[in-house]
Amino acid sequence: MAIKPTKSFQNCLEAEVPGYNDCPTVLFSIDPNSGPRSKSKQRTKSKRCVSGRLATEVLDLYGNTKTATTPPPVLRRPSVTAAQQESACEGVLVKDQGDRQLQPILCSKEELVAKINDLCVCGSKLSSKELEFYKKKLDSNITKILQNEHTKTVLSQIFNEKDKNMAVKTIKHWMVTDTTISNWCPAFLKIFENAMPN
């Protein structure tokens, strides 16, 4: 078995090393005085990237004529008024299995505050630290929560629901459809889901 001598690549051109740079040469700056040549040997001998920097304006050798353009500006979402928000959340209002609209039993503001407080003080599967964290979130927002009529209607529906799983589904659907409740409703959901039955 013969041992092949190793070749030194210290004093050679990049083109002499097979597979050294498989990237297309179009990515690197090109001498503007030298146009595209037909013979590949002449092209490989000329140095395409003397400075080693990527070119910002590349001479197109492959026939692509489109230049890069800036993307269109990002459009802002239109602001939603409270009336539009309530109309978007109408799907959350009380519906039974046959999709008939039922008359919700509305609770007063005081009744809802009492029910939320009862929910927080009854037994919970959450640790006391978690429960305190979520309770603080609710307590800090309770006055703002109960100013909105739609919120009072949905909370009344949730508290009057006999099936806890249906109430949890209602809360989750409400969270998806109404963005105005995002600062307190996840905490309410956590407390509601983990509340122990009386």
From Swiss-Prot:
Phosphoserine: residues bearing it: 79
Example of a GO cellular component annotation carried by this entry: cytoplasm
Location(s) in or outside the cell: Cytoplasm
Keywords: Cytoplasm, Phosphoprotein
Stated induction or repression of this protein's expression: In response to the DNA-damaging agent MMS.
Main location, first listed in the record: cytoplasm
One GO BP annotation of this record: ERAD pathway
Domain of life: Eukaryota
Function, in words: Involved in ER-associated protein degradation (ERAD).
Miscellaneous note of the record: Present with 1270 molecules/cell in log phase SD medium.
Name of the featured protein: Alpha1-proteinase inhibitor-degradation deficient protein 37
Gene source species: Saccharomyces cerevisiae (strain ATCC 204508 / S288c) (Baker's yeast)
